[in-house]
Amino acid sequence: MSDYQISTDCLHAGYRPGNGEPRNFPIVQSTTFRYETSEEMGKLFDLEASGYFYTRLQNPTNDTVAAKICALEGGSAAMLLSSGQAANFYAIFNIAGCGDHIISSTSIYGGTFNLFSVTMKRMGVEFTFVDPECSEEELNAAFRPNTKAVFGETIANPALTVLDIEKFAKAAHAHGVPLIMDNTFATPVNCRPFQWGCDIVTHSTTKYMDGHALTVGGAIVDSGNFDWNAYADKFPGLTTPDESYHGVTYTQRFGLEGAYITKATVQLMRDLGSIPSPNNCFLLNIGLETLPLRMKKHCENAQAVAEYLQGHDKIAWVQYAGLPGDKYHQRAQKYLPNGTCGVVIFGVKGGRAAAEKFMAGLKLASIATHVADAKTCVLHPASSTHRQMNDAELAAAGVSPDLVRFSVGIEDAKDIIADLEQALENV
């Protein structure tokens, strides 16, 4: 755990230049690395030494940024991937396979829901989706002998459900499995799930971490707190020899703090790819350096937008946990005391047709599939990101047909509100 505040770590964690070295770490744009002898390289292939030999597994630039994100979350180890989808897939597939079972909150990003309910189902991994507001008894009833993890989002995209992390962590640990949390919308600036019992955190770094809609990427951070050895029979991939590395046992060789990420890197990344380019990681780091400043502005602007919409006669409903009357306000005060995120959701009176007319009338805000970057953008999830869901699945995910997802940027709040006002006048 770093001794610095998070705003300092956003600038300095992961890289401290030596005498005469560049203040900004270099982009190591190379596929391979030279060694003097085959013996030296052989030790890398046997995991007996640390170093780099092929960028499909690891690269110095990537690892520098991963170390920064690890520090921001307060974890023990981290890795970067080519997208948030890849991060969520690796996070699950690293400990679960054909014949295994995962519990997930229903209130998650549509792409993640499809990954779980369609793609990973075809791979033999079964998912049970639970209402995030279910009782402890209902949550515990969802577990099976072959359950390997529980998954949720700190702030759900796009429903903005604030998950009760402690409730889900308690249930997961009672059944000997880790809690995996996607912390994309909150970022470690506003919430550190490890402090509430979460074991593994994922991110779509494409969103606030990058912050400028420049690079697609993902991250996985391990807390190092989950005792894989205590439940060795559940997690043989970590606690028994890996034949592809001459019988190395990850928990023995790398300890509880390094086993999970090491396996995901040297086994899954080796076989499946998904490594981001060093250049993309360099660009991601530029975004990370200003993350606290941007999150503060995003939250301030979103609060102003939510308050404006709440009083507008053409708005049917508004949801933003920063509003005192919001159903997640008290929970947000507990888990996200410094602010939630820059996304506000609402419904325009007149339903879907009115929402689409409103969106078409916006001049400053862009209609885009993206969310959580510096420029304001807007989306209708039911016809885009959650289009693959049926009506029942949409309802379970908290996505109504009239829901508008408004990603508030860091422009002047007066200009954002003026754009909303002129668009609503024509509805």
Please place each PLM-identified region on the residue numbering:
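N-terminal "arm"/small-domain region of PLP-dependent enzymes with the aminotransferase-like
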Residues: 1-59, 67
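Conserved N-terminal alpha-helix of the aminotransferase class I/II PLP-enzyme fold
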Residues: 37-89, 111-119
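Glycine-centered tight turns that cap/initiate beta-strands
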Residues: 74, 146, 314-317, 364, ...
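Short hydrophobic/aromatic beta-strand micro-patches
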Residues: 221, 345-347, 407-409
